[in-house]
Each structure stands twice: as structure tokens, then as C-alpha cells.
Amino acid sequence: MSKDPMSKPTPEPAAHSKAGPAVPTNFLRPIVQADLDSGKHSKIITRFPPEPNGYLHIGHAKSICVNFGLAKEFGGDTHLRFDDTNPAKEDQEYIDAIMNDVKWLGFEWAGEVRYASQYFDQLHDWAVELIKAGKAYVDDLTPEQAREYRGTLTEPGKNSPFRERSVEENIDLFARMKAGEFEDGARVLRAKIDMASPNMNLRDPILYRIRHAHHHQTGDKWCIYPIYDFTHGQSDAIEGITHSICTLEFESHRPLYDWFLDNLPVPCKPRQYEFSRLNLNYTITSKRKLKQLVDEKHVNGWDDPRMSTLSGFRRRGYTPKSIRNFCEMIGTNRSDGVVDFGMLEFSIRDDLDHSAPRAMCVLRPLKVVITNYPEGQVEKLELPRHPKEDLGMRELPFSREIYIDRDDYMEEPPKGYKRLEPNGEVRLRGSYVIRADEAIKDADGNIVELRCSYDPDTLGKNPEGRKVKGVVHWVPAAESVECEVRLYDRLFRSANPEKAEDGASFLDNINPDSLQVLTGCRAEPSLGHAQPEDRFQFEREGYFCADIKDSKPGQPVFNRTVTLRDSWT
């Protein structure tokens, strides 16, 4: 076998100019450390409480890494608890997908999966206690009336005419709500706090609403369901959560979180902490809008590689490590800001640069016949699977007929062109130097074949008396594997896709070139055995992953994970 000592890696991109802070910060670490040092807590328990009404997205990844990462760092536990209080929008499909995503990211929750619905009986009993204490009442206002009575940020609200119902009447009405006597929306149970509070969340918030809907966990047992604010703090208390960590939009909810804990006989009183959510440009993370993209078939499902969902990133070829590293890189703080998508791409490039085997795949094949190479002869070349890591060697047959990329030959090249041109020379990666002698064209003038000659003295060394600057990738014609390649790009053209012009929709920002499907591509023989989720660097093309759904050994389908360089800067 011939081994090419001059085979060199494709030049790698430099770190993205916005690669994040040199020292990532997490303001929660010293808080947790102080709580342990003071003896306030002997063990840290955090939780990740998604609502099962959609797939997890990249913003959830930050929350997962914060909660699971902190607990792991300090020897604690993290609970996975589904906030399943809105059965009309929830589905077992989402529950299964969320559990798979958490595991895929590399985290394990403590004990069994938990559900807020497990605590419905206790939450109901606590609601009755608030009624008995004169701190909750059944309200008959319509939603429109309730909005009017609530006031505004600059004007106080006013008390509902039903606010002073007797305890006995409220107990009776709440029991009848539970028994299913009333239609959806006819009545709600409210906490009696302060309609003049400057914090809108304390203006008699809803505790329970009527919803005749089948629940995926409790069936038809309930037709009244607690809202998130009444569920989340008490669930934390039941589970002994020490640090209830959420995003900054819940900061104004913390007084209500504490009010419930102060006014109910809960077993412990967790503390809520808030951090800034992940705002990633060129991305949408609204579950409602992500669902709209799926339902209206702008994308091919929740796991479409252009989606910001974790299952989408996984299918595109992102690794769990790259996403964890990205979340660590951007830090955890309380300052809202927008993170450049290039930082996420830098993270996956950095990971795959070290871990992805190299291979060659010709996306737009152009047949090359090497006229002076002996007919019937096949030479076995050896190329390294990786330029630095010890991943072994791969065998590549070389013979008279090969494919190169159509873009690597130009009859009238621009200045500085270093690929193949008439009477010009290039080196085939890991192989010989060839010269373009003749271009064969069809009746329409399209080039269908190149006739070239090779220099047999150039395997592993430069030719005598001349310098060859260009290097192109290639595959053998007979032994190469036909494959499909999907070139994915950012789904949105705008850095802020939700900011549409007047009368426009975020859908108007969809990038029409976000997916290009290439068929008839030719890959080196080793890629024919690729398993779903196998990742590679296609030399000179980018990083690719065998599709988790559609790729099969012998019939590979590859998704472009990321280009070799940031093409958006």
C-alpha cells in the first residue's frame, strides 16, 4: 500500500470573533457554596420543570445545564418535573421527547420522573385552606371584565364585586367547580392579596380555572386545574428543592411565589433565583411559533435540522458536548443580551475539529479520466482518518477514473484561482498531481468529463521544477458510494426574526435557501458504512452527520452540521 506523507488537514477556521468571555461566569456558584458552608443546606436539590407542550429548544439547554450542572458540581440532585397543568396543550409525545433530550445532553435526574399532577390533591387541599383563611375567593367576572378590573401598570386595579363572598359560599362554589357543574371559564378561584399592588402579579391572581379536558396522567379525575404560579412553588416545597432557578421573566413572580409559601403549611420554603434567558440571534424559541412552523409545514417536523429544538440540533449533527460547552461559554448572569449564533457554531466546530474523522465527498461530481494511468490498475492509498488524533488510517482506491467537484474546474478562472483549469495542475488530496488536458462537452456546451494526465512521480512529493499550489478532493469512480447530501443553513435571514415590518410576520424572514438537497453525490467507500449520527469532516466542504432517520448503511444521507468557516460574518 502507498502512504502519502504529504497529506495535510484542510485548513481550519480560526475561533469566531465573538467566542465569548475568556472566563465564563456563574453568579449562582458562590450562592450555593455559601449556603452549604453556612449549613443552611446540607445538600443541594434543583429542578428542571418543563411544560410538556412542545419540544425543548436551545434556550432550555441553558436551563438544563444550569440546574443539572450546579447540582452535579456540588454533589446534589436535580429533579425532572413536568409542569403538566394545562392538559389541552400537552401530549405524551412531548414528555418522551423531553426525557430523551435531557439524557442526550448527558444528564440524569434523581429518582423517578415527577409530575405536578402528582400533587393535585395536595394543591386542592391547600386552596381550600386559603379559602377557609379568607385568602381566596371564587370570582364570576368574565375574562374581559377581569382585565378591566385588574388595572394597568400606572393605574391600580379595583376589587371584584365577588371578592367579599363568605367563606361558606366560596367553599361551596369551589366544590361545585371541582364537581364539574360549571362550563369552562365560568368561574375561577383567586387569591385575595392586593388589587392596588404595583406588582401586577399580586392583584388577586388566579389559582384555579375550569377546564373540562382529559389529562394524560390523571385522566378525567379533574376538571379544575391549578395555574403555574400556584403549582410551581408548592411543588418545589413538596420535593424539598433548595434552589428554584428560573429565567428573569419570573423575577416579578417571586413575591407571589413567596406569598404562597408564607401562607400555606408547606414542609419547607425554597428560594427562587433568576438568571438571564438565552437570546440567540437568527433564532426563534417561542414554542407557539415553533409549533406554527411545524403545523404549517415550513419545516419538516420538530426535529428538522433547521429548528432551534434540541432534537433538531441533534439531527443536524451537533454533539451534546458542544451544546454544554456553549452554555458554559456564555455564562450564567442576570444581564439580558443577545448571543451571536456564531458562538454556537464555534463550539461545534471546535468539538468536531478534534473528534470528527476526515473523509472526502464530492457534492457535484465531474468525471475525470486519467488517460495515462494504466487501464485495469487499482492502487490502494492510505490516508489518515484525522490529522492529529490517533484515529487510524483509511484505504482509498485510486484508478483511471475518478470524480472531482464540478466547482474545481473552470475554463476561464478569475485571478488567484488555485484549482484546475485548462493545462493547469492540481494535487489530488493524498494522491498524485494531475493536469487538465481536455474538457468533453455535451450538445449544450456543458462540461461532462475531463481528460487529464497524472505525474507518476508525485505521490508523496512535489514535482520536479514546478510548484503546484492547489489541492482538491476526489473519490474513485467505481468504488465510491452514491449518497444524498442536505446543505442546511440558518432558517431565518434576519438576526432578529421576530422583529418584522409593520403588517409582516416572522414567517416573512424565513431564509428560502435554508435547505438545499443534493442527490447523486459521490462519497469515498468508507462512508458507505456510516451509521446514523456518525459525524465527519468532509474535506474542504464542512462537517456532516449521517441523518438519524433517513440514512442507512449503503444508502447514506448526510446533513451539513456547519461550514468550515463562518460564512455569515
Swiss-Prot record:
GO terms for cellular component: cytosol. InterPro entries: aa-tRNA-synth_I_CS (IPR001412), Gln-tRNA-synth (IPR004514), Gln/Glu-tRNA_Ligase (IPR050132), Gln_tRNA_ligase_bac (IPR022861), Glu/Gln-tRNA-synth (IPR000924), Glu/Gln-tRNA-synth_Ib_cat-dom (IPR020058), Glu/Gln-tRNA-synth_Ib_codon-bd (IPR020059), Glu_tRNA_lig_a-bdl (IPR020061). One of its GO terms (molecular function) is glutamine-tRNA ligase activity. Residues 1-23 are annotated as: Disordered. Belongs to the class-I aminoacyl-tRNA synthetase family. GO terms for biological process: glutaminyl-tRNA aminoacylation; glutamyl-tRNA aminoacylation. PROSITE patterns: AA_TRNA_LIGASE_I. PANTHER family: GLUTAMATE--TRNA LIGASE, GLUTAMINE-TRNA LIGASE. A motif ('KMSKS' region) lies at residues 284-288. The keyword ATP-binding applies. It is found in: Cytoplasm. Its main location: cytoplasm. A motif ('HIGH' region) lies at residues 50-60. ATP binds at residues 51-53, 57-63, 247, 277-278. Monomer. L-glutamine binds at residues 83, 228. Signal peptide: none annotated. It comes from Pseudomonas syringae pv. tomato (strain ATCC BAA-871 / DC3000). It catalyses: tRNA(Gln) + L-glutamine + ATP = L-glutaminyl-tRNA(Gln) + AMP + diphosphate. Keywords: Aminoacyl-tRNA synthetase, ATP-binding, Cytoplasm, Ligase, Nucleotide-binding, Protein biosynthesis. Its EC number is 6.1.1.18. It comes from the Bacteria. This is Glutamine--tRNA ligase. Pfam families: tRNA-synt_1c, tRNA-synt_1c_C, tRNA-synt_1c_C2.
